[in-house]
From Swiss-Prot:
It holds the Pfam family PIG-L. This is Mycothiol S-conjugate amidase. It catalyses: mycothiol S-conjugate + H2O = an N-acetyl-L-cysteine-S-conjugate + 1D-myo-inositol 2-amino-2-deoxy-alpha-D-glucopyranoside. Gene3D superfamilies: LmbE-like. Its EC number is 3.5.1.115. Binds 1 zinc ion per subunit. A mycothiol (MSH, N-acetylcysteinyl-glucosaminyl-inositol) S-conjugate amidase, it recycles conjugated MSH to the N-acetyl cysteine conjugate (AcCys S-conjugate, a mercapturic acid) and the MSH precursor. Involved in MSH-dependent detoxification of a number of alkylating agents and antibiotics. It comes from Streptomyces coelicolor (strain ATCC BAA-471 / A3(2) / M145). Transmembrane segments: none annotated. InterPro entries: GlcNAc_PI_deacetylase-related, LmbE-like_dom_sf, Mca. Belongs to the MshB deacetylase family. Mca subfamily. Induction: Transiently induced by thiol-oxidant diamide, under direct control of SigR. Also induced when MSH is oxidized or conjugated. PANTHER family: N-ACETYLGLUCOSAMINYL-PHOSPHATIDYLINOSITOL DE-N-ACETYLASE (PTHR12993:SF11), N-ACETYLGLUCOSAMINYL-PHOSPHATIDYLINOSITOL DE-N-ACETYLASE-RELATED (PTHR12993).
Length: 293
């Protein structure tokens, strides 16, 4: 009898799950995979990015509650489970020099202690596969970088009963694979950019490509390409549910859906660790697991 496949996606803030790997999650849900999103913070220090909602006094005063409601709506759209890790948003520091991070925020937590909270989730849910961000956080937000750190510690720590005793953290369990989300990769961005220009359409990616080198991003190894074009509409619907964070008329939604599906019908990942044999490149996060489950 085949064991239930389970995928855990670890994210920093509400809305990250809908902008990074959402179509992949929706695809796996449709196949009967149990998918759980773990959200590390409440996004309390996030700015209101939707111009139509800026200046709304209720939202500004109740941003934590509003973002939780948005997360719940997105969760229902994607069909996933979702749990909070309970840490406080660090905010994105700006200025030169950068100001210190606020006391008590996620990025200043002890890594091993914070990872212990994720160990509890892993031991309870028992996913074979975990997704998160690379060591740069996908982009250098302190909460994204911290999310990477605690996920990698928890991947190993979930099976370590000395570091995380079963009496406190639950029955030990070892996940089999951990991936980095790499959906915002240069090959995809360039392909969509040129596809739009070739069709005489305006591209929202031109400035993005010009600024790419400013982030000093190394080119990542895209090991895994998950076909999920049939779920792009669900992805966008979930993202729009985060109304405070997304302008539905902004550049994110300027690329016609038919072009996205034709030019780049996959979401990309980088296999960071695997305890099972697999052959690269992959088209399935459960490659090497599915046949043995």
């Amino acid at each position: 009898m085949t064991d239930q496949l389970r995928l855990m996606a670890v994210h920093a803030h509400p809305d990250d799950e809908s902008s990074k790997g959402a179509a992949t999650m929706a695809k796996y849900v449709s196949e009967g995979v149990d998918v759980l999103v773990v959200t590390c913070t409440g996004g309390e220090r996030g700015s209101i990015l939707n111009p139509k909602l800026q200046g709304d006094a209720y939202i500004e005063e109740n941003i934590h509650e509003v973002r939780r409601k948005e997360m719940d709506e997105a969760r229902e759209i994607l069909g996933v489970g979702q749990e909070w890790l309970g840490f406080v948003d660090s905010g994105l520091p700006e200025g030169d020099p950068l100001p210190p991070l606020p006391e008590g925020c996620f990025a200043l937590e002890d890594v091993d202690k914070a990872a212990g909270e994720l160990v509890r989730k892993i031991r309870s849910f028992r996913p074979q596969v975990i997704t998160t961000y690379d060591e740069n956080g996908g982009y250098p937000h302190p909460d994204h970088i911290m999310t990477h750190k605690i996920t990698m510690v928890a991947f190993e720590g979930a099976a370590d009963t000395e570091k995380y005793p079963e009496s406190e953290y639950g029955t030990a369990y070892q996940p089999l694979k951990v991936y980095y989300n790499q959906g915002f990769n240069r090959p995809r961005t360039e392909a969509l950019h040129h596809a739009l220009l070739d069709r005489g359409l305006e591209s929202p990616y031109e400035d993005w490509l010009k600024r790419w080198s400013e982030f000093e991003r190394k080119e990542r190894t895209l090991t895994t390409h998950v076909p999920c074009a049939d779920f792009f509409e669900i992805r966008d619907k979930a993202l729009i549910a985060h109304a405070t964070q997304i302008d539905p008329e902004g550049g994110w939604f300027r690329v016609p859906m038919e072009i996205q599906k034709e030019v780049w019908p996959t979401e990309e990942y980088e296999l960071a660790k695997s305890l099972v044999e697999t052959s690269l490149p992959e088209d399935d996060l459960f490659a090497g697991i599915r046949d043995n489950a």
